[in-house]
């Protein structure tokens, strides 16, 4: 059976994925599947830098505004829904463009990760529960941070069930020291991985500027509205960068200025971790946006690369 080409456009936060993804989709007759763990949530628009309807320019997007902020969305569920949408898009004879920077979401499509198998791994779960009883939640949360810092940052340490579940996913059928070791490529798809990057200082400037724009556009008001709607601060969705810092400002833990600076700092650190993650994709083609006169020049070069890559 012919593999479905899976065009994956990724890169660190604020690099410029959204604009380019729309241009690529329009030129390649593609529909877009979002691989962003924050844009999945309704009502969380400003802090997630969610693509707007106007920005979409009529290009169909999937896995945006998919669930309410109190829904415990998992990597396993992302994989199930994304696979369903991939087949729907393919049936329409359109290209599939996956765009976003959540590494675990991308891995769940690139590699043959069987979450049903991890669901059945009772022995591992019992061992983790035993460690939890002996060493406590702080130890377990720190262990998760070593394996998957992004999930650890989003899962509150008091949510023991989610911490254990995330550790199960990380530890199922692989070596602990490298998430993608021992994983085989998904045989259904031909992943064509494109990683966007920029000069580090320029990227950090863009991150700082984006945070300033989020604040100006009403991030504080967005968080207040979420609280007024009954969404709690210990929810997974509320642990996202931008949201957790504003919550601490509203609780009086940070000043307004401190909250903004910490969002910028944490976003820069996140970008650095993302770049490290993407370097594991040995077949990926990297493009430095700062080396191009304009976005159309870059878009045309990427389209040529994609056409040459499709088997």
Curated annotation (Swiss-Prot):
InterPro entries associated with the record: Dimethylallyltransferase, IPT, P-loop_NTPase
Molecular function per GO: ATP binding; tRNA dimethylallyltransferase activity
This protein's UniProt keywords: ATP-binding, Magnesium, Nucleotide-binding, Transferase, tRNA processing
Cofactor(s) the protein needs: Mg(2+)
EC class (word): transferase
Residues reported to bind substrate: 13-18
Ranges for region Interaction with substrate tRNA: 36-39
Any matching Pfam family: IPPT
One GO biological process term: tRNA modification
TM region(s), chain numbering: none
Site feature Interaction with substrate tRNA, where: 102, 125
Binding positions (ATP): 11-18
EC assignment: 2.5.1.75
UniProt catalytic activity: adenosine(37) in tRNA + dimethylallyl diphosphate = N(6)-dimethylallyladenosine(37) in tRNA + diphosphate
Assembly behavior: Monomer.
Function: Catalyzes the transfer of a dimethylallyl group onto the adenine at position 37 in tRNAs that read codons beginning with uridine, leading to the formation of N6-(dimethylallyl)adenosine (i(6)A).
NCBIfam families: miaA (TIGR00174)
Family label: Belongs to the IPP transferase family.
Protein name: tRNA dimethylallyltransferase
Organism: Clostridioides difficile (strain 630)
Source organism phylogeny: Bacteria, Bacillati, Bacillota, Clostridia, Peptostreptococcales
Gene coding for it: miaA
